[in-house]
Amino acid sequence: MSPPEGRVAALDLGEVWTGVAVSDPTRTLARPLEVVRTSELPGVLRRLVREEGVGEVLVGLPRTLRGEVGFQARRVSDRLSSLRAGFPEVRFVEWDERLTTKVVSGPLREGRRRGRRERVDHLAAARMLQEYLELGGGA
């Protein structure tokens, strides 16, 4: 299967908030884009497909430290099934995102506690996307 055309987006799906990142047109660099309410995600994806030219979406799957699919990963998989049904023109890719949020939140621990979570979600999505791009994902 040939890779889809356009940019790649990444989602760090949460219960309430979802971090969003997007690649550049050459699929070389990831940039944090925004944090949105998870309930508003279908509208955000429509906008990304239309305005950013996104053809592929990377979705972080929060496996356990043992690499197993736990409760959170099952919840993400359920949401991913709904997104796939609503966006048949987009290729969705699951990505093991273990510890991504912890890695990016370390430098932010010194900052204010309130609001930190929102900043971390889109940074986690960007880190995940950058790893994917560097490993040749979507190429």
Swiss-Prot record:
> Which key words are in the record?
Cytoplasm, Hydrolase, Nuclease, Ribosome biogenesis
List the EC numbers from the record.
3.1.-.-
Any idea which GO molecular function terms this record carries?
nuclease activity
Q: Give the protein name, as stated in the record.
A: Putative pre-16S rRNA nuclease
Tell me where on the tree of life, at the top rank, the source sits: Bacteria
The answer to whether keyword ATP-binding applies is no
Membrane-spanning intervals of the chain: none
Which family is this protein grouped under?
Answer: Belongs to the YqgF nuclease family.
Where is it mainly found? cytoplasm
Return one Gene Ontology term, BP aspect: rRNA 5'-end processing
One GO term of the cellular component aspect?
cytosol
Q: Where in the cell is it found?
A: Cytoplasm
Function statement: Could be a nuclease involved in processing of the 5'-end of pre-16S rRNA.
Organism of derivation:
Rubrobacter xylanophilus (strain DSM 9941 / JCM 11954 / NBRC 16129 / PRD-1)
